C-alpha cells in the first residue's frame, strides 16, 4: 500500500519561486495528488508532465538555474569592465531577468515579440541581439540541453 509520486524541484524553490515537475504517472489517489500538489505549490509552480518528458523537463528546469547564473555572471563581468561595481551589477542584472521573466509570464507574449518591442531600428539593442546571434547564443542553449540529455 505504498504510494509513490515523483516530484523534481529546482533550487529557486528555496525562495518560493521554484518549478516542481510532477510526474503524471503515479500511484496516488486523487485526493492525495491534490494534497501533494498543494504542498509543493507553496514553493513555486507545479507542472505535471508525462513520464517520458520528466528527463527533458528536469534538464531545463533543474539545470537551467546554473545557466542563468552563468548568464548573470557574464553580464556582470561586462558591467564591471565598464565601471559598475560588481554587487550593483549582480543586483541590476538579476532584477532585469526577474522582471523580463515576469513580463513574459504575465502577458503571455511570445519572447520574440517582447524582444522586438525593445529593439529599435538601427538601435543599440538590435546590435546587441545581432552579436548574440552571431555568437551562437541559441545554439549554445540547445547544445547545453543536448549535453545533459546525452549524459
Regions found by a protein language model. Give the residues of each.
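Rossmann-fold dehydrogenase core element
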Residues: 1-11
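Residues at secondary-structure transition points
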Residues: 2, 27, 62, 66, ...
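Internal alpha-helical scaffold of NAD(P)-dependent oxidoreductase catalytic cores
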Residues: 2-3, 19-57, 68-106, 149
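Short pre-catalytic strand/loop immediately N-terminal to key active-site residues, enriched for Gly-Thr
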Residues: 4, 54-59, 111-116
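Short beta-strand segments
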Residues: 6-8, 23, 119
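NAD(P)-dependent Rossmann-like dehydrogenase/reductase catalytic/cofactor-binding core
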Residues: 94-151
